[in-house]
C-alpha cells in the first residue's frame, strides 16, 4: 500500500477503487458501509432522489444492491493544519483525466434488467464543503470518443491522455468550430450546496486547488446512475 501525496479519503464502497480489482471486495465493503450511510445520510439520499427525479423526469433510486453514493474528502483531519507539502500537491493536477466507466464492473447486475442504457450513463457531484478559493471540474466536452477509445482511454498515463485529447480527429468533428487543441479544458465551478451532473462519456478531471490554505477542505457527494427498465439506479 502506498501513501497518497495528498490528504484524501473516501467514504462508502467505491467501484473505481475496489470493484476494478475485485467486485467481491466491493460488495463486501458495500454490505458493511451501506447500513452506516443509510443511518447517517438517509435524509440526504431522500433529497437526492427527489431532486434528481424532478430534474430528469424519471424515477431516481439510490440502489442498495450497489454501493450507495459516497464521499470524496480532501483536506486535513479535524484540529490539524496541512503543511506546505500537502498544499503544494493539492494545487497540482494529480487526479486522473478519465471517462466514467465504472458501470462495466457491474454488468452481472445490469443483466437482471430487460432494458439497460450503458451509453447515456449519468455522473454527479454535490459540493458540500469547498476550499476558500473554490473548487471545480475540468471538462473536455468537445471530445467525442468511439467505444474503443472509451474502453482504453482511462488506462493510460495522464500525459498520454493529453496527447490523445490534442488529436485533431477528436475536435474536428463539428462539435466546436475552429477549436484550438492547445487551450485549457473548460472549468466548471462548483457551488456549495449545488450539484453538477452530466450524461454520457464526458472526459473530465478533478480540478486542482487554487492558492490552497492550511485548513481548506473539499468534501463532495459522488455517484453514478444507469437507466434500467425506466429507473435511474444510482451507485458509487
Residue ranges and their predicted role:
Residues 1-18:
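Intrinsically disordered, low-complexity, charge-biased terminal/linker regions in eukaryotic proteins
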Residues 14-91, 108-117:
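Signature of the catalytic double-stranded beta-helix
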Residues 80-189, 233:
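Catalytic core of non-heme Fe(II) oxygenases with the double-stranded beta-helix
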Residues 122-126, 213-231:
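A short hydrophobic beta-strand segment most commonly corresponding to one strand
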Residues 179, 196-198, 229:
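Alpha-helical transmembrane segments of integral membrane proteins
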Residues 186, 203-212:
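Short beta-strand His + acidic residue motifs that chelate non-heme Fe in jelly-roll/DSBH
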Residues 188-204:
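Conserved metal-binding segment of the jelly-roll/cupin
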